[in-house]
Amino acid sequence: KHMETPMSADPRNDLYKLYARFLQKYQPKMFVFENVMGIKSANGGATWLKVQEALRSVGYEIECHEQNSKNFGVLQNRRRMIIVGWLKNSGLSYPQFEQTIADATVNDILSDLPALQPGGKSGEYRSDDFSDYLRSTGIRKDSDILTHHCARPNKDRDIEIYRRTIELWNDGHKRLNYNDLPDELKTHKNRKSFLDRFKVVEGDEAYCHTMLAHISKDGHYFIHPDIERSEERR
């Protein structure tokens, strides 16, 4: 049976030491260090203190602030801790970022993607007519080839849950609670936590919830907001 590596034993926890060695060798005037919000509380806060100490020890002043990608024109609610460092006595400081909310919705970034059958994939966009947001951000270009557009295999039971999840959101911006499903659609034994395990992407909003690295475990968390596409997947 596959056993996951405990977070405390993950070798990536010490990558900041390698980062500090690069800083010490190349001595850039400034650097940016990004990490997830959880770094502040990892190991009771000890890891966060060690990271800051390592960066300061190689000759840098540092400052850290929480930043959110949605405040920089990105259609995703993604909070991160951003450390900016500069050489001591350089007179530099943490930048004052101009924040901009995108004049677009998440649907604008999904509009040119073709519908897929369960387990299917496509390497072609559905149309050459794409949104101004895709054009202005450079996400979509005339010569672009569509990549990584594939759908997970879905059971009929999951598709029915998707339909209910989408209707709840589109009709009243409400989230589906797993315990509100009829018994014939419930397969998970855990009925006390992760009750929002089925979640639709907020297509009509200026940003959606955070995309996760472990999407294989949370694949029901990013349901396409178009109800017609949900029906097509049958």
Which stretches of residues belong to each language-model region?
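Bulky hydrophobic/aromatic "packing anchor" residues in well-ordered structure
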Residues: 67, 110, 211-212
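C-terminal target-recognition/interaction regions appended to catalytic cores
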Residues: 135-234
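A structural signal for well-ordered alpha-helical segments within the folded catalytic domains
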Residues: 17, 45-49, 104, 108, ...
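Conserved Class I SAM-dependent methyltransferase catalytic core
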Residues: 11-86
